[in-house]
């Protein structure tokens, strides 16, 4: 059985700078996969780069926002995951107090569909930090 090392770059789509850096690393074959954060501002651009490059891509499951100034928006529009008019909860406590199981499930499915509907095959899922 052969062995190989997987080097995955996290947070593809987080912002234009990070998207560009990950794209360059993928094209240079310095990393072997990436995880796309579909609720982040540059997600659509990252998905298009992944499709064009044929990159191995996972979905970075995210149900809260890291950015307090520019709150990320839900892919599903699930009401219990967002503070009124502000986007996804920044606080894990706020999320835990309000999130409904069916909304969490709908959001995770919407994040998978965000990628797959753009012609990119999702080959793994990732959860990190406090996102899920």
Name these PLM-found stretches.
Residues 68-97:
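Active-site gating loops and adjacent loop-to-helix segments of metal-dependent hydrolytic enzymes
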Residues 10-12, 37-39, 60-64, 128:
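Active-site beta-loop-alpha junctions enriched in small/polar residues
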Residues 102-127:
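CE4/NodB-like, metal-dependent polysaccharide N-deacetylase domain
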Residues 1-16, 22:
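Boundary/entry segment of secreted carbohydrate-active catalytic domains
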Residues 4-6, 31-35, 54-60, 122-126:
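Structural preference for beta-strand elements that scaffold enzyme active sites
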Residues 130-132:
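Conserved small/polar residues in nucleotide/adenosyl-binding loops
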Residues 22-28, 44-56, 73-82, 117:
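Acidic (Asp/Glu)-rich catalytic clusters
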Residues 16-41:
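A short alpha/beta connector and helix-capping loop motif
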